Amino acid sequence: MVQTKRQKAIDLAVVPGKAYGIDEAIKILKTATKAKFIESVDVAIRLGVDVKKSDQQVRGSTLLPAGTGRAVRVAVFVPSGAKAEDALAAGADAVGMDDLAEKMQAGDLNYDVVIATPDAMRVVGKLGTLLGPRGLMPNPKVGTVSQNPGEAVKNAKSGQVRYRADKAGIIHCVIGKVNFDDEALKLNLQALLVDLIKIKPTASKGAYLQKVSLSSTMGPGVMIDQSTLSLK
């Protein structure tokens, strides 16, 4: 692919292995934006964990203070009644039990998040082969199995992100869009890192947040100097 002079200059400006202060890193990301769409801002966090060990797996969710900039479609499995009404009032795009399961089995899977109350999991369990591979299976560790579906829907619609360390011990997550204010992106990143620190496995030894890098959808990765972040 032929690079423009501008893109070459941007790539040269990012020194491999150098950690940049968060403010400078965000400016580099915004300068590097080249797509005709509004790019997402992604973070990759290498953790000091051995995910092969069951007591060092990291999985959770964070409500980003500035949201994600994405419209989120939410389906909720909940028996009819007050909780179902709460979910609808909170903005759920679909609510049901067996009827909702039948629609999903027929191919209606255009959802970003699936939430369920504990008593609805008997229905959701039958959809494991459909929801599991898509990362949609409700799980209490990320707040998608909840006694309060209304609150869970509000969180999902307000910018809650879910994450899980991959086989290499890396968390990948979207923390906003390149058109966000610099401060909003910084606050979102700090909120995510603070929550990750809170769920650090006790068996994890040594440096936990080993490497934090930001990138836009089409831009270069920029390693962050963690001392420029507020993580308390």
Curated annotation (Swiss-Prot):
A cellular component annotation (GO) from this entry: cytosolic large ribosomal subunit
Keyword tRNA-binding in annotation: yes
Repressor keyword on record: yes
GO molecular function terms listed in the Swiss-Prot or TrEMBL record: rRNA binding; structural constituent of ribosome; tRNA binding
Disulfide bridge positions per record: none
GO biological process, one term: translation
Entry keyword set: Repressor, Ribonucleoprotein, Ribosomal protein, RNA-binding, rRNA-binding, Translation regulation, tRNA-binding
Domain of life: Bacteria
InterPro entries found in the cross-reference section: Ribosom_uL1_bac-type, Ribosomal_uL1, Ribosomal_uL1-like, Ribosomal_uL1/biogenesis, Ribosomal_uL1_3-a/b-sand, Ribosomal_uL1_CS
Function: Binds directly to 23S rRNA. The L1 stalk is quite mobile in the ribosome, and is involved in E site tRNA release.
Family: Belongs to the universal ribosomal protein uL1 family.
Subunit structure: Part of the 50S ribosomal subunit.
Designated name of the protein: Large ribosomal subunit protein uL1
Taxonomic source organism: Xylella fastidiosa (strain 9a5c)
The gene coding this protein: rplA
